[in-house]
Amino acid sequence: MFTQSDTGKIEEIFTTNTMAFETTAITFFFILLICFICILLLLAIFLYKCYRGHNHEEPLKTLCTGEGCVAANAEMDKPEDQDKVLMHFLNMGLPMKPSILVQKQSKEEMATSLGDNIKAEDYQKKQTYEPVNARETNHEGELAEKMPIHVHRSSDTGSQKRPLKGVTFSKEVIVVDLGNEYPTPRSYAREHKERK
């Protein structure tokens, strides 16, 4: 059925298919090897930087003797002083840039301010209802002549509402330094809420 030429063609097709498969497999293997080498190289660089950064964070202590040295060592052990010295060295030689400072209130301050707001709302509600109750004791003729007194909240207290369940309110103070044009920084207070 098959002749000699058909058998040769089949063998030729089979050898070309296996060669194409081998070249694809070798190419895939080289790409995989290059990716593995790059990952190892990045890991080595990361570990080197971590190790190098860890060594520089430890403070260098100088050896000294005498009474003045004990006081100097006691002062250097305070964390506040170390932060000041560190910030001084970090900011040395850098020009001042326009910046934004965000300061958040602590939870205790927020709890007291929210409590004060609720008390203020209750007080204002009492003020609106007390004149109405006082007018009821007057004669009916006088009551008809007087217009009802409405007490409106200011815009500051109107924007503050009671907290919702599962919502955290926080207040930020944003200080904006506008550079050389406006030498005094300006601050803005902004409230926002976050869901838990």
UniProtKB/Swiss-Prot annotation:
Membrane protein topology class: Single-pass membrane protein
Entries under InterPro entries matching the protein: DUF4642
Presence of keyword GTP-binding: no
Gene Ontology cellular-component terms listed: membrane
Keywords carried by this UniProt record: Membrane, Transmembrane, Transmembrane helix
Segments crossing the lipid bilayer: 26-46
Subcellular location: Membrane
Highest taxon in the source lineage: Eukaryota
Listed PANTHER family: HYPOTHETICAL PROTEIN LOC690352
Record's protein name: Uncharacterized protein C2orf74 homolog
Organism: Mus musculus
